[in-house]
């Protein structure tokens, strides 16, 4: 309002003296402006040089951070958890107390390394720090709950799982992960409750329908699963054909299932889940060469949680095809990875005699 009042004030007549005074000021300012421009140009060069040096320092810091992080990951893969902890901490030290997505992800790695190294309390402290930073961090609650579940502290596990579900929003993968954790702990009823929360998340995108169909499939509600998955497919969700194949498989419609698995693999050859499922189906049908091919492809991709199933089926496929040398070699590796599988140990003794 003040600006407007000044702007609209009635102009007064300008005297000749005022005109001359302004001209003198303009002439003086013109001389000064040349000197000022020289100073500005000089300061611009200094500033640009400073920014360039700062940029180089930032690049070096980021490179160091990335290098330490990769060293930590490599150490974990080699079983050197103490080395991994040090590397991840060095990566975090590069951040100078600045917290972003990369730092949070590095903290997850650090906590996993701490737990693997037998430093349970340190891992708990790291997860708790993540929670203190973001009270709605569903992932941190889930991982802390998973730690307590592994330690058979089910009260604390459930407490953190409930908080993870509370803040999961429309993260269907979180609800499914919670179900899987409960299933592993023999708490199927609690796990199903988490799945139901996932259904309640709502949403009408192709991904929403696909994930709800997947959840109904886990709940054994095949009619609703098919309805949701069909809608997702109509909305052009390519991932859904994998879940529909699994639905056909549990319903005993093997031909339909195999067709969808193959169709999915043709477009997504980097998905180990489909490869493991199709490999298992080919094994059951006696198509051993085909089964071996799919299972080896899955293992080459790192089958993750399905690695044990893939490797076990690969051994059976080799054995059934008469390739006992390959079966024995694969079994040697399997028994190292899964020493508590007593059935496999007995099978290994059998293969030793072939």
Language-model features, listed with the residues they occupy:
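Register position in tetratricopeptide repeats
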Residues: 77-78, 116, 150-151, 184-185, ...
């Amino acid at each position: 309002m003040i600006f407007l009042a000044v702007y609209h004030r009635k102009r007064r007549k300008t005297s000749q003296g005022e005109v001359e005074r302004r001209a003198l000021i303009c002439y003086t300012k013109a001389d000064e402006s040349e000197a000022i421009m020289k100073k500005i140009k000089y300061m611009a060069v200094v500033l640009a040089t400073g920014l360039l040096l700062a940029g180089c320092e930032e690049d070096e810091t980021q490179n160091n951070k990335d290098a330490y992080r990769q060293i930590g990951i490599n150490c974990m893969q080699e079983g050197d958890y103490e080395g991994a902890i040090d590397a991840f901490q060095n990566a975090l030290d590069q951040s100078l107390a600045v917290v972003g997505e990369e730092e949070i992800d590095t903290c997850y790695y650090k906590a996993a390394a701490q737990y693997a190294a037998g430093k349970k309390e340190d891992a708990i402290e790291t997860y708790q720090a993540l929670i203190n930073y973001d009270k709605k961090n569903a992932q941190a609650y889930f991982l802390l709950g998973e730690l307590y579940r592994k330690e058979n502290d089910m009260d604390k596990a459930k407490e953190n799982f409930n908080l993870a579900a509370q803040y999961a929003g429309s993260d269907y993968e979180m609800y499914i992960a919670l179900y899987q954790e409960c299933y592993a702990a023999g708490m199927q009823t609690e796990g199903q409750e988490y799945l139901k929360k996932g259904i309640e998340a709502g949403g009408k995108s192709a991904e929403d329908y696909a994930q709800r169909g997947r959840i109904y499939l886990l709940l054994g509600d095949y009619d609703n699963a098919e309805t949701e998955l069909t809608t997702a497919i109509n909305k052009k969700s390519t991932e859904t054909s994998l879940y529909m194949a699994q639905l056909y498989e549990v319903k005993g419609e093997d031909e339909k299932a195999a067709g969808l698995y193959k169709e999915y693999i043709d477009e997504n050859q980097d998905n180990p889940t489909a490869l493991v499922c199709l490999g298992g189906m080919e094994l059951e049908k006696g198509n051993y060469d085909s089964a071996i091919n799919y299972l080896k492809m899955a293992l080459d991709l790192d089958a993750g949680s399905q690695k044990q199933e893939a490797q076990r089926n690969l051994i059976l496929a080799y054995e059934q095809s008469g390739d006992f040398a390959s079966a024995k070699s694969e079994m040697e590796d399997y028994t190292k990875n899964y020493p508590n599988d007593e059935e496999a140990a007995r099978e290994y003794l059998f293969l030793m005699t072939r």
